[in-house]
């Protein structure tokens, strides 16, 4: 396993005692992403020559696809993000099979296989996930306390360029309105504005899905958490100029 130092990825792997090699931090600019691509490819190539894998498996990883192609090994990719055009272009030509949800809106030809469901069901279906009530105590919440999760993303992915979510002013007004009726927690991928620090959600990242399950409402810029809430049965509002087939289908299904 190789993992980029992004958000809580390394912390999750550490908490589950899963061994991995860090690829370091990614970059936000296009030129920075290009040089990081070269760095990550070389790192993965070095590791692969030592480990000698029979198969590369990734979630839309250009690095895994490039190195698998160099070594003549098959690469299987999963993705559910149609609008990640640059990312798709970087891995698809070097990938043997790409799996997507059935409602994925793009077609990638003969190597494209679809499955009935959403990516988030791989870990949030009833046979994989059971909500834990103890997380409420960790947040000093009582069973009947109503709380809302607001999620802010970093906007550093290649497909985020030119797009945005909440403005600072709108976010402050939104929090002011919600906290008249419920407790507000901010889940933030980047830096929290200083005047909103008191709302930041401080938790063990392994608890996040239990917290989302118990939330009264989720409002966020992140598609993954919005989809997770749909699976968990928590009402969610997705705030983003980008959409995805999975989210649109979940809305149609009243999830």
Which positions does each model-derived feature cover?
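Donor nucleotide-activated moiety binding/catalytic core segment of transferases
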Residues: 40-44, 189-225
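Structural motif
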Residues: 54-55, 97, 147, 183, ...
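Active-site and donor-binding regions of nucleotide-sugar-utilizing enzymes
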Residues: 5-109
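N-terminal subdomain of nucleotide-sugar transferases
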Residues: 1-2
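A donor-sugar binding/catalytic signature common to diverse glycosyltransferases
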Residues: 55-62, 67, 77, 208-249
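A nucleotide-sugar donor-handling region in carbohydrate enzymes
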Residues: 99-164
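Active-site regions of enzymes building and remodeling cell-envelope glycoconjugates
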Residues: 16-22, 73, 110-120, 194-205, ...
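Catalytic donor nucleotide-activated moiety binding site of glycosyltransferases and closely related
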Residues: 5-6, 15-27, 150-152, 172-204
């Amino acid at each position: 396993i190789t993992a980029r130092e992004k958000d809580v990825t390394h912390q999750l792997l550490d908490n589950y005692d899963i061994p991995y090699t860090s690829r370091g931090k990614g970059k936000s600019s296009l030129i920075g992403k290009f040089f990081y691509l070269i760095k990550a490819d070389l790192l993965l190539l070095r590791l692969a020559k030592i480990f000698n894998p029979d198969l590369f498996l990734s979630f839309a990883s250009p690095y895994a696809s490039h190195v698998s192609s160099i070594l003549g090994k098959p690469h299987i990719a999963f993705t559910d993000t149609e609008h990640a055009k640059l990312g798709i272009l970087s891995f698809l030509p070097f990938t043997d099979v790409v799996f997507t949800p059935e409602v994925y809106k793009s077609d990638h030809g003969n190597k494209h296989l679809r499955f009935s469901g959403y990516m988030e069901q791989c870990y949030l279906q009833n046979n994989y996930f059971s909500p834990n009530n103890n997380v409420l105590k960790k947040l000093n919440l009582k069973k009947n306390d109503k709380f809302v999760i607001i999620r802010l993303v970093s906007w550093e992915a290649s497909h985020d360029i030119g797009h945005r979510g909440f403005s600072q002013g709108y976010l402050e007004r939104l929090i002011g309105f919600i906290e008249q009726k419920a407790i507000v927690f901010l889940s933030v991928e980047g830096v929290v504005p200083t005047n909103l620090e008191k709302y930041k959600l401080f938790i063990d990242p392994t608890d996040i899905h239990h917290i989302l399950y118990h939330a009264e409402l989720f409002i966020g810029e992140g598609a993954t958490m919005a989809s997770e809430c749909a699976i968990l049965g928590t009402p969610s509002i997705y705030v983003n100029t980008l959409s995805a087939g999975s989210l649109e289908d979940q809305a149609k299904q009243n999830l």
